[in-house]
Each structure stands twice: as structure tokens, then as C-alpha cells.
């Protein structure tokens, strides 16, 4: 199999614009309609299209550059592999030449007046970290196109029927000749439907659909992360001419929490610790999210503070983080300690602090003593004394 870059006559460093220009030139030169249906031209044209379909797709091009034809000729010819299956020259021509030339390829195969699937819809939903942690059932209101209940989707007034378009004869497409090309395009009179509604339905005004708001219940699974997507099949817009409904895609956004940050399945939380507790050791309460067995029904959990704890020390509580979507695993709650210096001291408290300071030395403050020693050596090196 020939190298795709060689087929298009370009180097491996060519940019997108150069690639498109090279393809356009070769496609026009080798198009079968310009070569009297020559089999060699048809084969060359197919080869050019295949090469461009891979190199114009960043992911496929990266796979091809790394693995060659093996990287794009997957067994299914699907995402990540071209393989020649599912290839439609009209998709490429629409991209490069526009609709006029794109409609020439496969246009006759596409039945504009056939049942059409409804549009997919997107709904952005904000949820709390608590809802992401425990799961939730949320009601949303979604506007969507519904089949008109009066005309049952025909667009025509009850008791009447749409007429066949006289321009396209019901095909939904018309054919015209432009230079070397025989071009098919959507019928301008009926809009490609092949039918004309002469007496429109008063409820949908001839569209066959009306827009309505629907209330849907959405189940948020425990453990979802920010940016997760939920698909509700058949909850999108109604299809045209009896086609199936589209799907509804719900994109989740988890609002920032005032206490917790999420890191994968772990929850991170900074908790202030009294100076005395940090020095002597002890226990403090840390917040945790309610749900399951992680906090035993409480919204706080006991954290052991080791003697001499410093700011920035972390304590990891196993299994008290977020649940996993795909297993029974749970993350951890990671508590970062922040040693709090007391303020607004009374005279007696200040006196005791001074007394404590006089009793503390290098043994009690090893980091301070180490820092002083380093600073002293630095000063001696600078001054030469």
C-alpha cells in the first residue's frame, strides 16, 4: 500500500492549509467525470480521497505517522482506523469544495424525504459535591421539539395531506449541470422534503413539530466527576417524517466546595490545629461528607494529631473519600494540618508564652536551630569573617 504523503505529493511536515490545497488540485485533476469514467482515474481518485481522509484528521494522522497503515486500518474501520469502511467522498468534498461539489457524491443515495432522526440536545447541569458523593435524583426542565399532536407530524391541517412537490417530483432533490459536473442539490421549493404543505396546521404552522418544555428526572450516580456526561436515549428532539427521537446529553459541572477539593477519588481538606494540640498531640474533628459508611452517619471524623505536628503535615484517612463509579473502591480523606498561632493574648498568657520561650531550646525547635546555623555560615562566607 502506497504512502499517503506520497499519494498527495506532499512532505510529512505539511500544514493543514497546504494539505487541503494539494488534495483540491489532485481531486479536480483525477475526478472520473473529468476523465470520461476512466477506471484508472477512478482508482486514483479513490486513493487520493483515502489519503486525505486520514491525513486531514489530526488523530488519524498522528496514528499513521507513528504506526503507518497499521495504525489506521483497524479491523472495524471505525474511530482510530480508516480501513476504507464507512468512507463517503461527499464528506470530504463538503469540507474542501463546499456544498455544490459535495452534493455530487452520494447525493442520490440520501433520501431527503425519508424519515430523519431528531436532533440531539445538550443540557448543562450544576450539582454539588455532596450530590456527586452520594448520588442524587434531580428534576430538570428541557425544551424540546415534539411531534405535533394535532396533525401528527404531517404539518398539514387535519383532513388534508401534503402535496407532492412538482419541482422535484417528490424526490426532494433536483439535478443541474455545471461545467464538467452533474450536480444534485436539495430542492429549493420544498426544502428537500419532497412535499408541499398547502393548507398548514394551525397548531404547528406547517412544521409538523411544536416546542414544549418537559420535566425529566435524572439519576446522578454516586462518584461522578466534574465534566461527566449522562446520555438519556430518545429524550432529544422529535424526528421528522416518523424518524426516531434524538438523545439528550447532560453535562455535569460540580460546583466548588468551601471545605473540600477533589483529587481523583481523594478528598483534600485543610483543618486548623491549636498550637498546644500540635505541640502535645491529640485529636481534632475534621469534616467529611455524609453518606455510606465513611463517617458513621456523622458529618465529622476524628483525626489523630501526632506530637510536634507542623503546618503542612497530612493525615490520610483510608476509605473516607469519594466512591468509584465502576467499583466498590473508595478514595481517602487527606487532612492537611494548619498550626494556628494564638492571637489576642491576655497579659498572663503572654507571660506564660515568654516563660515557655525561655525554656525551649534547639531540642524543642530543631528546624529553627538548623536554619540559624545555615544563616550564620552563609553570613560568614559572604563577609569572610
UniProtKB/Swiss-Prot annotation:
Principal subcellular localisation of the protein: cytoplasm
Chain ranges of zinc fingers (CR-type): 135-213
Binding positions for Zn(2+) 1 per the UniProt entry: 148, 151, 201, 204
Segments annotated as CXXCXGXG motif repeats: 148-155, 165-172, 187-194, 201-208
Keyword Cytoplasm: yes
Note on cofactor: Binds 2 Zn(2+) ions per monomer.
Cofactor(s) this protein cannot do without: Zn(2+)
Matches recorded under CDD domains: DnaJ (cd06257), DnaJ_C (cd10747), DnaJ_zf (cd10719)
Protein localization: Cytoplasm
Keyword annotations of the record: Chaperone, Cytoplasm, DNA replication, Metal-binding, Repeat, Stress response, Zinc, Zinc-finger
Annotated J domain residues: 3-68
GO cellular component terms attached to this protein's record: cytoplasm
Domain comment in the entry: The J domain is necessary and sufficient to stimulate DnaK ATPase activity. Zinc center 1 plays an important role in the autonomous, DnaK-independent chaperone activity of DnaJ. Zinc center 2 is essential for interaction with DnaK and for DnaJ activity.
Reported function: Participates actively in the response to hyperosmotic and heat shock by preventing the aggregation of stress-denatured proteins and by disaggregating proteins, also in an autonomous, DnaK-independent fashion. Unfolded proteins bind initially to DnaJ; upon interaction with the DnaJ-bound protein, DnaK hydrolyzes its bound ATP, resulting in the formation of a stable complex. GrpE releases ADP from DnaK; ATP binding to DnaK triggers the release of the substrate protein, thus completing the reaction cycle.
Name of the protein: Chaperone protein DnaJ
Amino acid at each position: 500500500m502506497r504512502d499517503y504523503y506520497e499519494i498527495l505529493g506532499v512532505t510529512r511536515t505539511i500544514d493543514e492549509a497546504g494539505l487541503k490545497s494539494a488534495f483540491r488540485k489532485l481531486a479536480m485533476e483525477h475526478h472520473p467525470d473529468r476523465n470520461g469514467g476512466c477506471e484508472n482515474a477512478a482508482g486514483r481518485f479513490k486513493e487520493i480521497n483515502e489519503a486525505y481522509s486520514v491525513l486531514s484528521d489530526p488523530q488519524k494522522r498522528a496514528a499513521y505517522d507513528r504506526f503507518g497503515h497499521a495504525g489506521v486500518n483497524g479491523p472495524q474501520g471505525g474511530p482510530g482506523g480508516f480501513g476504507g469502511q464507512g468512507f463517503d467522498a461527499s464528506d470530504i468534498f463538503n469540507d474542501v469544495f463546499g456544498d455544490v461539489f459535495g452534493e455530487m457524491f452520494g447525493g442520490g443515495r440520501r433520501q431527503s424525504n425519508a424519515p430523519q432522526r431528531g436532533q440531539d440536545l445538550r443540557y448543562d447541569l450544576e450539582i454539588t459535591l455532596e450530590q456527586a458523593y452520594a448520588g442524587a435524583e434531580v428534576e430538570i426542565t428541557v425544551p424540546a421539539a415534539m411531534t405535533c399532536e394535532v396533525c401528527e407530524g404531517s404539518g398539514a391541517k387535519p383532513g388534508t395531506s401534503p402535496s407532492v412537490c412538482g419541482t422535484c417530483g417528490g424526490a426532494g432533490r433536483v439535478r443541474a449541470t455545471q461545467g464538467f459536473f452533474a450536480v444534485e442539490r436539495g430542492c429549493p421549493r420544498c426544502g428537500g422534503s419532497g412535499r408541499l404543505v398547502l393548507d398548514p396546521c394551525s397548531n404547528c404552522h406547517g412544521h409538523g413539530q411544536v416546542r414544549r418544555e418537559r420535566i425529566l428526572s435524572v439519576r446522578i450516580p454516586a462518584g461522578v466527576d466534574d465534566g461527566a456526561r449522562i446520555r438519556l436515549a430518545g429524550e432529544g428532539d422529535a424526528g421528522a417524517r416518523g424518524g426516531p427521537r434524538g438523545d439528550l446529553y447532560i453535562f455535569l459541572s460540580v460546583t466548588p466546595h468551601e471545605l473540600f477539593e477533589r483529587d481523583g477519588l481523594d478528598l483534600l481538606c485543610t483543618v486548623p490545629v491549636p498550637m498546644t494540640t500540635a505541640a502535645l498531640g491529640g485529636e481534632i474533628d475534621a469534616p467529611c461528607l455524609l453518606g455510606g459508611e465513611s463517617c458513621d452517619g456523622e458529618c465529622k471524623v476524628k483525626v489523630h494529631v501526632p506530637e510536634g505536628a507542623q503546618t503542612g503535615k497530612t493525615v490520610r484517612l483510608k476509605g473516607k473519600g469519594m466512591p468509584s463509579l465502576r467499583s466498590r473502591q473508595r478514595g481517602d480523606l487527606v487532612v492537611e494540618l494548619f498550626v494556628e498561632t494564638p492571637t489576642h493574648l491576655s497579659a498572663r498568657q503572654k507571660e506564660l508564652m515568654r516563660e515557655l520561650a525561655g525554656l525551649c531550646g534547639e531540642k524543642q525547635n530543631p528546624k529553627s536551630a538548623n536554619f540559624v546555623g545555615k544563616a550564620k555560615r552563609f553570613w560568614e562566607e559572604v563577609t569572610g569573617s
